[in-house]
Amino acid sequence: MEKNFLNNKTINLTSVLNGASIIGCNNEHFGRAENIIAPGKGKNMGDGWETRRSRGKNFDWLIIKFGKPGLIKKLEIDTHHFKGNYPDSCSIQTANITKNLSNQSIIKNSKIWKYILNKSKLSAHKKHIFKKFLIKRSKENYLKINIFPDGGISRIRAFGNFVK
């Protein structure tokens, strides 16, 4: 991990291999949240994050803490294996939190984080790449994915660089 920081190599900031971790989510009915930051391609639906069906204007969310602060250049939302149970759309919010806060405080305050990806359509069994749609930000160390209204995601990848 330190090598990536020193040589400014583009890496997956949301990978468990680069120190990322899940700090919370509102639902993991069918698939564990930790699966979404695992390395490699999802083996099946059970190897992704999937929430229970909901109706109305509800949405599901998950928050990832990076191993170190980074600058996101490209997002990849992979719905591989999710054909009838993928989210209709998603949005991404980020924050750079420098205070030592509890996970509960971070989750509570995530409602006001800045958007780097406004609500965008998703489709079944596909790797969705978002580069030109990203709203430019400075360094971040937390990422929140909101899925509307529910569904499954195999992997999320935020490619960028660690920054000081």
Residue ranges with predicted function:
Residues M1-W61, L71, F82-K164:
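Trp- and acidic/polar-enriched beta-sheet ligand-binding modules for extracellular glycan
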